[in-house]
């Protein structure tokens, strides 16, 4: 995961704990989880739209080449 080892992750967690305090960590984690969920949803929508447009493209090309013949 991004080239981070266990020690680096523990260090980052300790820094976050010091910056935000133990009371804010659940709220921070909840917000981060919601943000990641929203990002994945948007990513899936974009991927589906791209695949859909790629599937529609050959059909349009076949129709135009057939009419040119």
From Swiss-Prot:
Plastid among keywords: no
Pfam families noted in UniProt: TatA_B_E
Transmembrane annotation, as ranges: 1-21
Bias type Basic and acidic residues, positions: 47-63
Region of interest (Disordered), residue spans: 47-69
Protein name: Sec-independent protein translocase protein TatA
UniProt organism field: Chlorobium chlorochromatii (strain CaD3)
GO CC, any one term: TAT protein transport complex
UniProt topology in membrane: Single-pass membrane protein
GO molecular function: protein transmembrane transporter activity
Protein family: Belongs to the TatA/E family.
Gene3D superfamilies noted in UniProt: 1.20.5.3310
Gene: tatA
Complex and partners: Forms a complex with TatC.
PANTHER family: SEC-INDEPENDENT PROTEIN TRANSLOCASE PROTEIN TATA
BP terms from Gene Ontology: protein transport by the Tat complex
Keywords for this protein: Cell inner membrane, Cell membrane, Membrane, Protein transport, Translocation, Transmembrane, Transmembrane helix, Transport
């Amino acid at each position: 995961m991004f080239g981070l080892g266990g020690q680096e992750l523990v260090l980052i967690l300790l820094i976050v704990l010091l910056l935000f305090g133990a009371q804010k960590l659940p709220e921070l984690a909840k917000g981060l989880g919601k943000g990641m969920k929203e990002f994945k949803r948007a990513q899936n929508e974009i991927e589906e739209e791209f695949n859909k447009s790629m599937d529609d493209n050959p059909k349009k090309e076949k129709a135009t080449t057939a009419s040119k013949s």
